[in-house]
UniProtKB/Swiss-Prot annotation:
InterPro entries referenced in this protein's UniProt entry, alphabetically: Mbr1
Protein name from the UniProt record: Mitochondrial biogenesis regulation protein 1
Keywords: Mitochondrion, Phosphoprotein, Stress response
Protein source organism: Saccharomyces cerevisiae (strain YJM789)
Record lineage: Eukaryota, Fungi, Dikarya, Ascomycota, Saccharomycotina
Phosphoserine PTM positions: 177, 224, 227
Region (Disordered), start-end ranges: 1-20, 94-130, 198-224, 258-325
Biased composition (Polar residues): 99-115, 198-213
GO cellular component: a single term: mitochondrion
Family named by the database record: Belongs to the ISF1/MBR1 family.
Positions of post-translational Phosphothreonine modification: 159
Highest taxon above the source species: Eukaryota
Protein location: Mitochondrion
Amino acid sequence: MRMEKTTDKSLSAGDMNDEYSRGPIDDIDCLNFFERAVQDPCCEACDTEDADEELRAKLSSFNFQPDSSPCNAKCQQTLNPLCKIDEALSAESELAPSRNGSVSEANSDTNSIASTVHDPVDSKYGGMPSLRKAKTTSYFASSSSNNTTMRNPLKKCNTNINGLLVNGRSSSSSRQSIPELFSGACTKKKNNVLLKSETPNSEFSSNSLQHCNSRSFSLPRSRSRSSAIAIPTHLYGLEKYVSPGLDTLTADPEESIERFSNNRPREISSCCPNDTGDTSSSLSHSNTSSSLNFPLGTNTNQFHQPRQPVQQQQSSKPNFGAGRKKSFIEMSLASSFAG
């Protein structure tokens, strides 16, 4: 038994590795013929296999060698965390400008460094592009287009201001011209009524008419004219056309009716004609006109009343409220006032 153990121990490590490695290699070759889901559906590596292949391809194409520029070497020395402190300080002192040197040289050095150093956010590293620095130059530095862009709004403002001034002047002149025109045209008033005997003055000539026409077109539409000019003067004298009998009727209707009945027969007797032909013709005309108002099938004779003398008919007309029957409304009102 001891000899067998020694023979097992006498096998080299390489032979053992070859024996154990042949089995799994053959198994992998066999599994490659099947689909991915058939191999191991619960394996997480199946889902990330494509991403791993993309990362491997990027790493294979990535250039790990730094640039050959001396500036990059200096920057990498300062950024290297394994470098010594003295070396980093010496590199910073080399980058800083000397006291005797000018500021422009230092600025040019920093600009050249910024232009030559590779951007860590470059697209080839898989990052987003960096933002650009804002321009510090003046807005109206060179081209004439900027001047034109500034002049156009200035012109618009000037035109608007001029238009407002012209409108204000025209409105003020029109306001002043209205009383000047009507001072010569309007005559004197007495109790807000024009006097017929008076005539307008001679100042209202053709020149003033032309002036009025020219000013009337310049008036803006939105402005309303004064009410005193728009209303004619004869409207103020309408009170003289109102008869005083209306006031008496509203005050005491019974007395006014009696006065009207007493005064009416005298006027009729003075105005009635002597000829009977005219009266008969007028009566026949009234009968025909009244018969026309009725329908054709009805008998109009029953509506006709016997003829009476003209004077009696005319004298009975003023007493229109004497023999009339009172309505229910009048009786109810009278009873309510009496109680």
